[in-house]
Swiss-Prot record:
The UniProt record lists the keyword Signal: yes
Keyword set, alphabetical order: Lipid transport, Secreted, Signal, Transport
Gene: Apoc4
Function, in words: May participate in lipoprotein metabolism.
Compartments, as annotated in UniProt: Secreted
GO biological process assignments: lipid storage; lipid transport; positive regulation of triglyceride storage; triglyceride homeostasis
Taxonomic lineage: Eukaryota, Metazoa, Chordata, Craniata, Vertebrata
Family, similarity comment: Belongs to the apolipoprotein C4 family.
Signal peptide location: 1-27
Domain of life, per lineage: Eukaryota
Protein name: Apolipoprotein C-IV
Amino acid sequence: MSLLRCRQQTLPSLCLSVLFLACFVASMPTESLTPTPGPENSRWSLVRARVMEMVEPLVTRTRDRWRWFWGPRAIQGFVQTYYEDHLKDLGPRTQAWLQSSRDHLLNKTHSLCPRLLCRDWTQG
């Protein structure tokens, strides 16, 4: 059970980290993703070149597919929808909650109070 709770607590931070990494990679110019030229006769440089051959098209395709998401319209639409769904009537909801909480607390206090001390003095 504690492992499940730990996973639920770390999931938002993991998602935020992945989102941050995606933003960072998407904002990098393509030139910075190409490897710096090194000695061509080294085996590691051949491996690095082969990996970059495979990874670079994948990164480019992913960036092109998700470009719409990073545009201002997508972010603006998300913020507007979030506001309309969650924040638009926050003031009236908060006032109603405070009023009902106060009434509930007063009723609870009144029911716990002895009749002699909390008697309604207006009725006589």
